[in-house]
Amino acid sequence: MARYTQRPENALKRANEFIEVGKPLRALDTLQEVFRNKRWNYAYSETVIEPLMFKYLYLCVELKKSHIAKEGLFQYRNMFQLVNVNSLENVIRGYLKMAEEHTEAAQAQSSAAVAVLELDDLDNIATPESILMSAVCGEDAQDRSDRTILLPWVKFLWESYCQCLELLRVNTHCEALYHDIARMAFQFCLKYNRKSEFRRLCDKLRKHLEDICKSSNQTTGVSINKVETQQLCLDTRLYLLDSAIQMELWQEAYKAIEDIHGLMALSKKTPVPKTMANYYQKLAMVFSKAGNQLFHAAALLKLFQLTRELKKNLTKDDLQRMAAHVLLATLSIPLPSAHPEFDRFIEADKSPLEKAQKLAVLLGLPQPPTRVSLIREVVRLNVPQLVSEDFRNLYNWLEVDFNPLNLCKRIQSIVDFIENGSENALLTPYIQSLKDVTIMRLIRQISQVYESIQFQRLLQLASFCNIFELEKLLVESVRHNDMQIRIDHQKNSIYFGTDLTESQREYRPDGPALQSMPSEQIRSQLVNMSTVLTRAVSIVYPNRERDQRAKLRTQMVNHYHEIKDREHQRILQRQKIIEDRKEYIEKQNNAREEEEARRQEEESRKAKLAEQKRLEQEQEERERKRHQNEIQAIREKSLKEKVQQISQTAHGKKMLSKLDEEGIKKLDAEQIAKRESEELQREAKELQSKLKSQEKKIDYFERAKRLEEIPLFEKYLAEKQVKDKEFWEATEKTRIENAIAERKDAVGQQERLKRMYPDRDEFLEALKKERASLYVEKLRKFEAALEAERKKRLADRIIRRREERRQAFLREKEEERLRKEEEIRLAQAAEERAAAEARRLEREADDEKRRAQYEKQRAKEEEAERKIKEDRERLARDLASERERTEKERDTWRPRGGDRPSAPAVGSGEWRRAAPTASERNERGGERIERGGDRIERGGERIERGGDRDRDRKDNEGADSSWRVRREPDSQRAAAPKDSNAQQSRDDKWRRGGERDRDFRNDGPRRDRDDGPRRERDDGPRRDRDDERGFRRNDGPRRTEEPQRETGGNWRDAPRNADRENRRPAGERRDRDVRETRGDQRGSAPKEASSGGGGGNWRTAPAAREEKPASKRDQPQEKENKAADDGEWTSVKRR
């Protein structure tokens, strides 16, 4: 169920009622519910919410509920910070005013309570209770009363200030209010002497300033780049500095000075002279309280310069007073110590030099000032001449004149003048410092005149100093290593510079000096001697220096002439660089100014847009509220009208008659509507009961009426059916007649158009005759272009596929080679590891075992040699029998269908088939010439891989084994005969694939490797192109164009298997190997005699050449490389 919420005006009335009956907490809860309800927060204007907020804050102040007040203030800020800032400012100021009034009232109440206690019994002022209380704690009655009565209100007021500052720190529209509240908080701390709260307030403001510097410029955010914001922050920090000085919180004052300096450095606008004068004045005061006389004098000097330059109406008296202040502050600076011992032994986070540099930055100085530099600046500004007559000689007495006997008397007169003059109260703090400086001057001057002096005499000279102060100053001088002093208390004497061998630092006299100390004289004796000798040499040789100068001048002139051009160029280059740099800097400055102008313009544009948006929002909010007020007024008016309207009705009169006048006033529109609805429901029930009785009557009457209507409806429907049938028949008859008439018209139109057919035919024939020749010409050109393009594409496809096959083969070959090399490497590594392990085991075995193993190995080697010899003899016999069988079968293997040609130079392919006709020989001649060289190269290779190895593999492995399973043993290869006949009997079957390799050479796999689509679509164009250029190398007869031979044939004519392996039974392979061996042997003589090889006939065979010995590359090699590629189909020889 939804929670009931009151309207703001009703909540205010109810809160007043709670206040009247003495329940402020209930009243505060009622108002708090309104601010927590989001429904009413933005639905009403400030004229409705502002009185509610004042009442809410009044209750919070009365009940000291600062956290509840904070919640309401934040809600009110969110509602009206963009709509009506003045309302928010009025609420906050009213809240703080109420808190201040209650705090002041509490303070007065506390004072009055103490006064009543004091005046309670005049005869018995010291009561036992007061005596015991004073013994227990050190507080008096006023302090206890303040802690009980005043302190809670002070705490509430402090929390109120903090809440308001936190509330307004990010709103640019309430920026002035924020700084006003900060000043009010400073006044609160001053009034009630709240130093801890003042420190927390300073930290809070410093944190807010850091947040402002870090945050971006939002719609309601505060930007530190604005001049107004910088000025407000600067004024607040100056007020903070004044408050800190009044409360004597010098640490906070120093932090405020740092903040002020940072704001002035951040501001692009030069601060006004009045602000700078106030800044230097406060800074000098802080330095004075910190005991830093050096920077105090520097701050006064900066203030003096600023006032003298910028203040036009400065009177002479004011100038003299300021000059005397600056002069006295400068001369009162303690004499600097050369080597402070704490700087050598104490390690701090920051060295004194870094601290001095930081303080110098606050004064705008490039480096930390010193006493000498300040005195020099004072003299440059002519300050000693600007002071009055009484102070004019002070500078000369302390810094110029050497008169130790009258020094203290002179300074005493000035001290007396300062102490007696009422207008010189500002100079009183410098008296003690001036006395200390005077005593130090006196001691230094006395040390230059006397070697020893009595204490009493020194006290007479230092008239304004006692013995304890004097001894302290003497010890300090020795401690800081400024002077050599020894005090003899027995003789009551003081000795100066007694140790002639000790000189701790180079002495540079500061102030008036008569002579150096004895130790300094001894230390500088060599320097003095060098000076005297130099002077004597100049007297003895007066022209030497002149000659040296002339010689040096000549060298300088020569050197100048040597480097003048280079220096001139360097100077010109430097000038050019400077000019370029100036231009670059100027461009950068212009760009920066343009960027700054753009940024400012963008910021102003954004500010204008934000302001315009705010105004639009305010206008929309006002319109919305006005609209809501109008709606509310209309609702109230309609409520009154509704009451009047209800009173005019019967049930309304009944309902209103039951209520008296007071009851009607207490009811609202909803309750009136509820009463009206109840009255209407009651009347409706009565009416419903009446209607039920009437319904029964009407139902009976309606049923009787419908029973009587049924015969009449049936008669009407029968008549209507007859009429509808007659109407349909008449309509159908009319439609048929219209269709017949339309057909007659269409037939007549067709007959008229038939007479135009001859003319149409004549026109079409004439048009076809005119266009026929042009069509035929275009068709012929198109077919020619189509044929050329088809041939071109077929040729490109043949070349591309051939290159793809070659690349695939080379890639497979390279992969196989790498694999085998890796296997060999692994095998070698395994062998090396096994050999190393064997060697290690052999070293561990004894001599007898090694000898026994040696004998066994010897027996095995003899047995192996015997077996090798037997194998060689057996192989020789097998080879001889194979050679005889080959010679017998050479004449029996003839092509069927004709006799062998008698020409001796026929190609090796003539014996394989019947003698071709002349046309066939001419057709295949070019292809045989191309194949000749390859056949010659392959012939020797096939002969090398002869039948010995094939037969051995068949005997040991069977017909279907491959080269991967077994190879010929090395012993058998070594035992094989070396003659050419034995080598010619070797075949190619040890290669990968066996028969497939030879089929690949003879174009078998070339067809098999092509896919189906190529064989079906591309064979025709490819064969046509091959017919134009002749047979390809190693290409067999074409399938589609080869005529059926009645007799004869060879292995090229046999059908091929689609399998890539293309393997045949072992018997068939043996027969074919025998036939190939015969053919190769038979064609060997012509191959050697012709350069084209065995691919031609007597017409195409070239002339015989002289037989040359086979080159080393063509000679058969004894040993074959087992790791070479076994699947190659090119003519590359094995290494």
From Swiss-Prot:
GO annotation terms (biological process): formation of cytoplasmic translation initiation complex; regulation of translational initiation; translation reinitiation
Taxonomic classification: Eukaryota, Metazoa, Ecdysozoa, Arthropoda, Hexapoda
Name listed for the protein in its UniProt record: Eukaryotic translation initiation factor 3 subunit A
Disulfide bonds: none
Organism: Drosophila erecta (Fruit fly)
Cited SMART domains: PINT
Main location: cytoplasm
Subunit and partners: Component of the eukaryotic translation initiation factor 3 (eIF-3) complex. The eIF-3 complex interacts with pix.
PANTHER family registered for this protein in UniProt: EUKARYOTIC TRANSLATION INITIATION FACTOR 3 SUBUNIT A (PTHR14005:SF0), EUKARYOTIC TRANSLATION INITIATION FACTOR 3, THETA SUBUNIT (PTHR14005)
Modified residues (Phosphoserine): 908
HAMAP family assigned: eIF3a (MF_03000)
